[in-house]
Amino acid sequence: TGPQTTCQASTCEAGCKQIGKSMKSCQGDTCECA
């Protein structure tokens, strides 16, 4: 494993859904929820 260098949309979306939000943007290693 290690630091993510590219965002995985499916992983980002799942993480956002866990906190009751949806994926806003997914760039580089940053997942933004909204």
Swiss-Prot record:
- For this chain, the annotated S-S bridges are 7-26, 12-31, 16-33
State the source organism's domain of life.
Eukaryota
Query: Per the record, where is site Penetrates into Kv1.1 and Kv1.3 pores (when K-17 does not penetrate into it)?
Result: 21
Q: In which tissues is it expressed?
A: Expressed by the venom gland.
State whether keyword Secreted applies. yes
Q: Which GO terms describe its molecular function?
A: potassium channel regulator activity; toxin activity
Q: Name one GO cellular component term.
A: extracellular region
Q: Which UniProt keywords apply?
A: Disulfide bond, Ion channel impairing toxin, Neurotoxin, Potassium channel impairing toxin, Secreted, Toxin, Voltage-gated potassium channel impairing toxin
Chief localisation class = secreted
Establish whether keyword Lipoprotein is in the entry: no
- Site location (Penetrates into Kv1.1 and Kv1.3 pores (when K-21 does not penetrate into it)): 17
Q: Where in the cell is it found?
A: Secreted
The family note in this entry says: Belongs to the short scorpion toxin superfamily. Potassium channel inhibitor family. Alpha-KTx 18 subfamily.
Print the domain comment field.
Answer: Has the structural arrangement of an alpha-helix connected to a beta-sheet by disulfide bonds (CSalpha/beta).
Q: What does this protein's UniProt record list under function?
A: Reversibly blocks Shaker B potassium channels.
Protein name as catalogued: Potassium channel toxin alpha-KTx 18.2
